[in-house]
Regions:
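N-terminal secretory targeting modules
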Residues: 1-21
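Short loop/turn segments at strand-loop or loop-helix junctions that form parts
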Residues: 28, 83-88, 241-246, 282-285
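Active-site segments of SGNH/GDSL-like serine hydrolases
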Residues: 229-256
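Membrane-embedded segments
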Residues: 21, 26-122
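C-terminal regions of proteins
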Residues: 251-316
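Short alpha-helical segments and helix-capping/turn motifs at coil-helix boundaries
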Residues: 7-13, 63-71, 223-225
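Secreted/periplasmic serine-hydrolase-like ester/acetyl group-modifying domain
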Residues: 85, 101-235
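Well-ordered, non-membrane alpha-helical segments in soluble/globular domains
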Residues: 64-67, 218-226, 257-268
Length: 316
């Protein structure tokens, strides 16, 4: 699958629209892209026979709302909806990319809430949405990416992948039938070369991780999240999922990222207990049983690490 010609949110929204034979559907960000029932190292095998991975880069609560509405309308065979909790999940507007399908979001939100409730929520967050739109328009990375696409003579397209070794990758990243991703051979090699002692890195890019120091969660976002879970529970069994960060990220517990993970994991378990939802995994790699060599970078675990997630299972 070559880059740029398709917006991945369109791809995964369409995957959600077509009924599959999967008994589990997983919602999350790039941290879950390696979760798979199609590989040798299967993930969530005790909970799922076959899963559909709807992991999207930079996925936020707004993405979950859009995809969940499509799931409710189209997925009849699934039994479990597994929602990945990130350090930024219980906030609104932590990434601008969901605005790609803002119209779908507005429709989904109206279906979730009564008219009076929806008017209140819409008024509360409209201003920040407009700010995000403006920021996205002037974002230098977005601008450069768009410019390169316009000037490129390459034939960016989606094509069927030939047989290849999943461990080594192939010329481009590959979307597997279950929605999980195999990185390109070039990316896999780069990751092997770039592995470093992350404990030496004292300052982390909080913006890239969707974390705002001190703002671990928002009341309004949590209310929307709870409403979403209750809506899904009418048709499915809902499970929360937490994936670990690299052990070296945890070496300095005064980092805002560590404080965020501790507070959010605590809040996620608190919400899960109230809603009678089970929780799989943890931000802490020691609890899951993951080692440094089982990570691709600071926040993305390999399929080997992710195959251990059910080592931490909290029933509610």
């Amino acid at each position: 699958m070559k880059n740029y010609v398709w917006n991945e949110r369109d791809i995964y929204l369409n995957l959600a629209k077509y009924e599959s034979d999967s008994d589990c559907i997983v919602l999350g960000s790039s941290q879950i892209k390696q979760i798979s029932s199609y590989r040798k190292k299967r993930s969530l095998s005790s909970s799922c026979n076959q899963l559909l991975n709807l992991g999207i880069n930079g996925a936020v609560l707004e993405d979950y709302i859009v995809l969940s509405q499509s799931i409710l309308e189209n997925q009849k065979k699934a039994k479990n909806i597994i929602i990945a909790i990130n350090a930024w999940t219980f906030n609104l507007n932590r990434d601008a990319r969901w605005l790609h399908y803002k119209d779908d979001y507005d429709i989904a939100l109206k279906k979730m809430f009564s008219e009076n409730d929806n008017n209140y929520i819409t008024n509360e967050i409209t201003a920040s949405y407009q700010t995000l739109l403006i920021k996205n328009l002037i974002n230098i990375k977005y601008f450069i990416s768009s410019l390169n696409l316009i000037n490129s003579k390459k034939n960016y397209s989606i094509e069927m992948a030939k047989d290849f070794n999943f461990e080594l990758g192939t010329t481009h990243k590959v979307l597997l039938p279950d929605g999980s991703i195999i990185s390109s051979a070039e990316t896999i090699e780069e990751r092997k070369k770039n592995k470093k002692d992350l404990s030496k890195k004292r300052e982390w890019n909080m913006q890239n991780w969707g974390i705002v120091p001190g703002v671990w969660y928002e009341k309004n976002a949590i209310n929307i999240f709870i409403k979403l879970v209750n809506q899904l529970k009418k048709n499915f069994n809902v499970i929360f999922l937490i994936t670990p960060y690299h052990p070296d990220v945890w070496s300095n517990e005064e980092q805002p990222s560590i404080k965020a993970m501790k507070n959010v994991e605590l809040k996620a378990n608190e919400i899960a207990k109230i809603l009678n939802v089970d929780v799989i995994g943890s931000f802490n790699p020691e609890k899951v049983g993951c080692y440094s060599n089982e990570f691709m970078d600071e926040i993305h675990a390999t399929d080997l690490c992710l195959s251990k997630l059910e080592n931490v299972y909290v029933s509610n």
